[in-house]
């Protein structure tokens, strides 16, 4: 494997004897740092997404509309922004912890995924998990947070069998139950 300490790898040998790119075509920048993401404001009346505190992982996304979400119901809410992510990255839309704890507001498909080639408005599918109280969202409210992460864009290779492990095919609640052998 050819790797530099700054992740500027171009070729990785693969068991099949062929070679493939370690990162998708078009990724040439230093992958240790992403200084900025191109953002298009579709609603200039809303604040720019930004971190509440310097070390926060996510930036706050704001609602473009007023909406009332009935208990147990969901609404697709626009954020008024579109972004251009570099190949090899993903945007993850997470609930805001305070809204989840105080109001029962969450995201249906948490975390939501913004793929690198998507250029449309980021929308959030919000759900009211409170059993009895509607949630009122006002235009401009912070409704979710966006986190940018690197992803491995791998190829899948079909095989006849997988290597053996202690866990094997035990899943969904099997951890801590002891051996099935």
From Swiss-Prot:
The keyword Transcription regulation does not apply. One of its GO terms (molecular function) is magnesium ion binding. It comes from the Bacteria. Pathway: Pyrimidine metabolism; dUMP biosynthesis; dUMP from dCTP (dUTP route): step 2/2. InterPro entries: dUTPase (IPR008181), dUTPase-like (IPR029054), dUTPase-like_sf (IPR036157), dUTPase_trimeric (IPR033704). Its EC number is 3.6.1.23. GO terms for biological process: dUMP biosynthetic process; dUTP catabolic process. Its cofactor is Mg(2+). Keywords: Hydrolase, Magnesium, Metal-binding, Nucleotide metabolism. Transmembrane segments: none annotated. Pfam families: dUTPase (PF00692). It is an enzyme of class 3 (hydrolase). Belongs to the dUTPase family. This enzyme is involved in nucleotide metabolism: it produces dUMP, the immediate precursor of thymidine nucleotides and it decreases the intracellular concentration of dUTP so that uracil cannot be incorporated into DNA. This is Deoxyuridine 5'-triphosphate nucleotidohydrolase. The gene is dut.
């Amino acid at each position: 494997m050819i790797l530099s300490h700054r992740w500027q790898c171009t070729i990785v040998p693969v068991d099949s004897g062929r070679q493939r790119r370690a990162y998708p075509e078009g990724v040439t920048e230093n992958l240790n740092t992403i200084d900025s993401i191109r953002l298009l404001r579709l609603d200039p009346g809303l604040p720019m997404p930004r971190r509440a505190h310097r070390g926060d992982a996510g930036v706050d996304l704001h609602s473009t509309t007023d909406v009332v979400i009935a208990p147990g119901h969901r609404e697709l809410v626009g954020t008024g922004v579109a972004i251009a992510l570099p190949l090899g990255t993903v945007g993850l839309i997470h609930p805001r912890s305070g809204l989840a704890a105080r109001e029962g507001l969450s995201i249906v498909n948490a975390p939501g995924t913004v793929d690198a080639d998507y250029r449309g408005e980021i929308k959030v599918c919000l759900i009211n998990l409170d059993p009895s109280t509607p949630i009122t969202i006002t235009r401009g409210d912070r409704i979710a947070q966006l986190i940018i992460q690197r992803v491995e864009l791998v190829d899948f290779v079909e095989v006849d069998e997988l290597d053996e492990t202690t866990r094997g095919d035990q899943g969904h609640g099997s951890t801590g139950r002891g051996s099935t052998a």
